[in-house]
Amino acid sequence: SKKLAMILPVGPMGMYKWAVFFIKEWNVSCDHVTTFNMDEWADSEGNTLPNTDPASFENSMNNAFFDRLGELTVPPEQRNFATKENLPTYPEKIAKLKSEGARLVLVFGIGRMCHIAFWEPQFAEEYSSEQEWKKECYRLGAKLHPLTIEQNAITSFKSRTTLVPCTANTIGPGLFLQADYII
């Protein structure tokens, strides 16, 4: 029942099937968990799709994970998605949880272009030092690398590159480097 903060990717979706299975099998309530989705498709201004749109990450997470947990699920008010309004609140919310004793777990993979979330390697060129880069907590309307777009076309858009958004909201190293544990 200790507080737990988790930064989650939207995929691979298969891992959520197993998480749901074990949470239900072991009858573990997630009422002590607060989640932060690491990214979301957005336009260059950071505006995201409605959460009811089948292409939105929030919709995907609700369908594949939260809704399937039933009464054991993470309470809706403890689910955070990378919208223009909510992503800037992540640093403060995570800091508060950690000050209350929560552990921060980061679940991630490294993309083909060596990105974590949609934090692309070419962003480093914009910072004068590594320390400055490490402080950046998020980016709204981040421009994605062409190989990231290609990777997402293959994995999520049936290889239709023109359907993949070129920008997204994403967490940055100022958040993912705070993790107490990584998976």
Predicted ranges, named:
Residues 1-6, 24:
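N-terminal glycine-/serine-/threonine-rich phosphate-binding loop
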Residues 5-10, 36, 182-183:
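Short glycine-rich or small-residue beta-strand-to-loop segments that form or flank ligand, phosphate
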Residues 28-107, 162-163:
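Ligand-binding beta-strand-loop-alpha-helix segment within the catalytic cores
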Residues 99-126:
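Glycine-rich phosphate-binding loop
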Residues 162-183:
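C-terminal functional extensions of proteins
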